[in-house]
A protein has these predicted regions:
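A positional/architectural concept
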Residues: 1-58, 63
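Charge-rich, low-complexity linker and terminal segments
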Residues: 1-6, 77-160
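Cys/His-rich microdomains that often coordinate metals
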Residues: 66
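Short Cys/His-rich "knuckle" micro-motifs
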Residues: 69-72
Length: 160
Protein backbone atom coordinates (compact mmCIF):
# COMPACT_ATOMS: atom_id res chain seq x y z
CA UNK A 1 0.00 0.00 0.00
CA UNK A 2 1.34 3.37 -1.00
CA UNK A 3 0.35 6.27 1.24
CA UNK A 4 0.77 9.82 -0.05
CA UNK A 5 1.96 12.18 2.67
CA UNK A 6 -0.53 14.77 1.43
CA UNK A 7 -3.20 12.53 3.01
CA UNK A 8 -1.74 12.99 6.50
CA UNK A 9 -1.22 16.73 6.70
CA UNK A 10 -2.88 19.19 9.07
CA UNK A 11 -3.08 16.83 12.02
CA UNK A 12 -5.24 14.24 10.30
CA UNK A 13 -4.74 10.56 10.99
CA UNK A 14 -5.05 7.86 8.36
CA UNK A 15 -6.00 4.37 9.52
CA UNK A 16 -5.33 1.35 7.35
CA UNK A 17 -6.36 -2.30 7.55
CA UNK A 18 -5.65 -4.44 4.51
CA UNK A 19 -4.32 -7.79 3.30
CA UNK A 20 -1.25 -7.77 1.09
CA UNK A 21 -1.56 -10.89 -1.07
CA UNK A 22 2.04 -11.00 -2.30
CA UNK A 23 5.36 -9.74 -1.02
CA UNK A 24 8.78 -9.98 -2.69
CA UNK A 25 10.73 -13.16 -1.83
CA UNK A 26 8.02 -14.61 0.46
CA UNK A 27 5.53 -17.41 -0.11
CA UNK A 28 2.40 -16.16 1.68
CA UNK A 29 -0.39 -18.77 1.48
CA UNK A 30 -2.83 -16.48 3.32
CA UNK A 31 -1.36 -13.07 2.52
CA UNK A 32 -0.23 -10.69 5.24
CA UNK A 33 -2.70 -8.75 7.38
CA UNK A 34 -1.49 -5.20 8.02
CA UNK A 35 -3.26 -2.83 10.41
CA UNK A 36 -2.14 0.55 11.61
CA UNK A 37 -2.23 4.29 11.36
CA UNK A 38 -0.23 7.17 9.96
CA UNK A 39 -0.07 10.68 11.36
CA UNK A 40 2.03 13.84 11.38
CA UNK A 41 4.10 14.68 14.45
CA UNK A 42 6.59 17.54 14.87
CA UNK A 43 7.15 17.98 11.14
CA UNK A 44 7.63 14.32 10.30
CA UNK A 45 5.29 11.47 9.45
CA UNK A 46 4.85 8.42 11.67
CA UNK A 47 3.56 5.08 10.42
CA UNK A 48 2.90 2.38 13.01
CA UNK A 49 0.87 -0.76 13.34
CA UNK A 50 0.95 -4.55 13.43
CA UNK A 51 1.12 -7.42 10.99
CA UNK A 52 0.36 -11.14 10.96
CA UNK A 53 1.11 -13.75 8.35
CA UNK A 54 1.83 -17.41 7.74
CA UNK A 55 4.93 -18.12 5.67
CA UNK A 56 5.62 -21.26 3.67
CA UNK A 57 9.25 -22.23 4.37
CA UNK A 58 11.47 -25.30 4.57
CA UNK A 59 12.90 -26.67 7.80
CA UNK A 60 16.67 -26.13 7.77
CA UNK A 61 17.23 -29.57 9.31
CA UNK A 62 14.93 -31.98 7.45
CA UNK A 63 13.76 -29.79 4.53
CA UNK A 64 10.10 -30.51 5.28
CA UNK A 65 7.63 -27.75 4.51
CA UNK A 66 6.74 -25.68 7.57
CA UNK A 67 4.31 -22.80 8.02
CA UNK A 68 5.33 -20.62 10.96
CA UNK A 69 3.13 -17.74 12.07
CA UNK A 70 5.04 -14.48 11.96
CA UNK A 71 3.53 -11.49 13.71
CA UNK A 72 4.76 -8.29 15.23
CA UNK A 73 4.58 -4.54 15.32
CA UNK A 74 6.21 -2.02 13.03
CA UNK A 75 6.90 1.70 13.04
CA UNK A 76 8.68 4.15 10.83
CA UNK A 77 9.36 7.87 10.77
CA UNK A 78 9.49 9.64 7.43
CA UNK A 79 10.42 13.06 6.10
CA UNK A 80 9.44 14.61 2.80
CA UNK A 81 12.34 14.70 0.29
CA UNK A 82 13.25 18.34 0.98
CA UNK A 83 13.36 17.92 4.78
CA UNK A 84 15.16 14.58 4.45
CA UNK A 85 17.93 16.22 2.40
CA UNK A 86 18.30 18.89 5.12
CA UNK A 87 18.38 16.18 7.80
CA UNK A 88 21.13 14.24 6.00
CA UNK A 89 23.14 17.41 5.37
CA UNK A 90 22.91 18.29 9.07
CA UNK A 91 24.70 15.08 10.02
CA UNK A 92 28.46 15.29 10.40
CA UNK A 93 30.65 12.70 8.67
CA UNK A 94 30.63 9.39 10.57
CA UNK A 95 27.82 10.66 12.81
CA UNK A 96 25.13 8.18 13.74
CA UNK A 97 21.45 8.94 13.29
CA UNK A 98 20.78 9.10 17.02
CA UNK A 99 17.53 8.15 18.71
CA UNK A 100 15.28 9.35 15.92
CA UNK A 101 15.98 7.71 12.60
CA UNK A 102 14.14 9.01 9.58
CA UNK A 103 13.48 7.50 6.18
CA UNK A 104 12.75 9.49 3.06
CA UNK A 105 9.20 9.56 1.73
CA UNK A 106 10.35 9.12 -1.87
CA UNK A 107 8.18 11.14 -4.25
CA UNK A 108 6.17 12.18 -1.16
CA UNK A 109 4.91 8.60 -0.75
CA UNK A 110 5.34 6.03 2.00
CA UNK A 111 5.40 2.38 0.96
CA UNK A 112 3.81 0.68 3.97
CA UNK A 113 4.18 -2.81 2.49
CA UNK A 114 7.93 -2.34 2.04
CA UNK A 115 8.27 -1.13 5.64
CA UNK A 116 6.39 -4.22 6.87
CA UNK A 117 8.53 -6.48 4.64
CA UNK A 118 11.66 -5.21 6.41
CA UNK A 119 10.12 -5.99 9.81
CA UNK A 120 9.10 -9.50 8.69
CA UNK A 121 12.67 -10.20 7.60
CA UNK A 122 13.98 -9.03 10.97
CA UNK A 123 11.40 -11.13 12.86
CA UNK A 124 12.21 -14.35 11.00
CA UNK A 125 14.33 -16.85 12.85
CA UNK A 126 17.71 -17.29 11.23
CA UNK A 127 17.16 -21.06 11.10
CA UNK A 128 13.46 -21.91 10.87
CA UNK A 129 12.88 -25.54 11.81
CA UNK A 130 10.15 -27.96 12.76
CA UNK A 131 8.80 -27.50 16.28
CA UNK A 132 9.26 -29.16 18.70
CA UNK A 133 11.43 -31.42 16.50
CA UNK A 134 11.54 -32.93 13.03
CA UNK A 135 9.15 -35.83 12.33
CA UNK A 136 11.53 -37.57 9.92
CA UNK A 137 15.01 -37.17 11.35
CA UNK A 138 16.69 -39.70 9.03
CA UNK A 139 18.55 -37.02 7.04
CA UNK A 140 19.51 -35.23 10.24
CA UNK A 141 20.89 -38.43 11.81
CA UNK A 142 22.72 -39.34 8.61
CA UNK A 143 24.91 -36.24 8.88
CA UNK A 144 24.92 -35.66 12.63
CA UNK A 145 28.10 -37.62 13.37
CA UNK A 146 31.26 -35.82 14.35
CA UNK A 147 32.82 -36.88 11.03
CA UNK A 148 33.18 -34.37 8.24
CA UNK A 149 30.51 -34.61 5.61
CA UNK A 150 32.18 -36.31 2.61
CA UNK A 151 30.74 -33.66 0.32
CA UNK A 152 32.90 -31.07 2.10
CA UNK A 153 36.05 -33.19 2.53
CA UNK A 154 37.62 -32.04 -0.74
CA UNK A 155 37.41 -28.42 0.37
CA UNK A 156 39.82 -29.19 3.22
CA UNK A 157 42.37 -30.47 0.73
CA UNK A 158 42.54 -27.21 -1.24
CA UNK A 159 45.95 -25.56 -0.89
CA UNK A 160 46.03 -21.81 -0.80
Amino acid sequence: MILKISQIINGSEVAFDYVEETMDSFDLPEGIVIKGRAYEEDGHYVVEGSYRTVLKLECVRCLAEITPIIQGEFSGRFLNPKDYAKFIDSLKPEEEFGELHFEEAVANEINISELVREYVILDLSEYESCLPECKDASEVEKYSKEDIDPRWQQLLEIKI
